[in-house]
Amino acid sequence: MEELQGYLEKDRSRQQHFLYPLLFQEYIYALAHNHGLNGSIFYEPVEVFGYDNKSSLVLVKRLITRIYQQNFLISLVNDSNQNRFVGYNHNNFFFSHFHSQMISESFAIIVEIPFSLRLVSYFEEKEIPKYHNLRSIHSIFPFLEDKLSHLNYVSDILIPHPIHMEILVQILQCWIQDVPFLHLLRFFLHEYHNLNSLLITQKKSIYVFSKENKRLFRFLYNSYVFEWEFLLVFIRKQSSYLRLISSGTFLERIHFYEKMEHLQMEHFVVVCRNYFHRTLWFCKDSFMHYVRYQGKAILASKGTHLLMKKWKYHFFNFWQYYFHVWSQPYRIHINQLSNYSFYFLGYLSSLLLNLSAVRNQMLENSFLIDTITKKFDTIVPVIFLIGSLAKAQFCTVSGHPISKPIWADLSDSDILDRFGRICRNISHYHSGSSKKQGLYRIKYILRLSCARTLARKHKSTVRTFLRRLGSGLLEEFFTEEEQVLSLIFPKTTPFILHRSHRERIWYLDIIRINDLVNHS
């Protein structure tokens, strides 16, 4: 019993008890304003919201004063809702919108404090240096290239959501024991739920609590995913242990789990009693890998198809009993790696089988041996990228380039810079593709879309404009890309474009997915 309880309580001893007073500290809202609204890559530019740094200090002081007042959040939501639909009293709506945004950002910053401190202390205790290169998205592909070639089956998992808000608060309660702060967070989430329901019934888009509160709800979602992955690792470790014990010891271990009654999470005890003993016995897999990305997960195994089906139903039962989430079977697809291609982080990944014959010579006899080697392959999903370009209005659905009218008012240098930056970012992100023909097609679409945009601005035809521009437009799209590649792979010979057709390059400076990849 000490083993399980110690595992569940691991890293949970440093709970923060006094987070609620931070809501009344001015510097918290300054951090929320600077990092959340003015400097983060996840948020819209500050000019969208209609305020700047000059007015932030006054508004923060006014916000702190109003927080002390009773029923502030109720009036805040009501004012935002009324002004959103009525359309008058712009100042009241602005203050309500700003206050709701700042409270949400401050909630996110405050709840991140104990987890950030725990992460820093973990690195200090383990004496682990901070390898920023491991944050790169591309760092996962060499891992998959090394591991997936030895596996047989892969399960595509769509993580169920949305989860009930009370479950989210209970998850945080295991880490944070500040009762007033949790009550206020619960009230804030319920007010968001009421506003969400109201806006849906009136067929309006969610404005106040959707686009601007990404940080808080991203944190809540990550805490939810971390909780079920935390218990998944525990079950995985127990299943590994079961391979080394006899059936009699295993039955005693089941009885041991059923006796646990003094854990902090009582609903987890119910899970242990009702279904834990039914899952541990079949979760025996000596070679399994798990990768999560963008609300999805991949579970690859060397086991049989029957084992993967057992893991599938294990996930269904686990989500239902522990998180009270009803998941449908279509959320998990089991496929054989040798006959399956899956879309992963902007790449179409698959496992290629290469047949080769090896001549073996033994004394006077020689014979051929057919060998099969597996190779993890990644290519550019051209259809998905064209669909993303079509959504961004760079081309039609069929891939025919069109002009970008909203950029026609910019200067020529700004238009060239924007198109060139998009083209270089796509080439940079998809540099790990084994086939570069798809990238050339995407570059052609962007290059011609840029030419059409410039021709539209100057009220000319594309042919006339390109004849006047010459090869300058082509150089604009390729110059900086060559410099980046030559820095990573210095050569004595100049960079030749067709050489990159055969090279797969993984960069260690990519920390977010390209926006066009997200559209797909």
UniProtKB/Swiss-Prot annotation:
* InterPro entries named in the record: Domain_X, Maturase_MatK, Maturase_MatK_N
> What gene, per UniProt, encodes this protein?
matK
- GO cellular component: a single term: chloroplast
Q: Which GO terms describe its molecular function?
A: RNA binding
What this protein is reported to do is described as: Usually encoded in the trnK tRNA gene intron. Probably assists in splicing its own and other chloroplast group II introns.
Q: Where in the cell is it found?
A: Plastid, Chloroplast
Q: What is its main location?
A: plastid
Q: Which family does it belong to?
A: Belongs to the intron maturase 2 family. MatK subfamily.
Q: What superkingdom does the record give?
A: Eukaryota
Q: What is this protein's name? A: Maturase K
Which keywords does the record carry? Chloroplast, mRNA processing, Plastid, RNA-binding, tRNA processing
What would be one Pfam family of this protein?
Answer: MatK_N
On whether RNA-binding is a keyword of this UniProt record, the answer is yes
**Which terms does the UniProt entry file under GO BP?**
mRNA processing; RNA splicing; tRNA processing
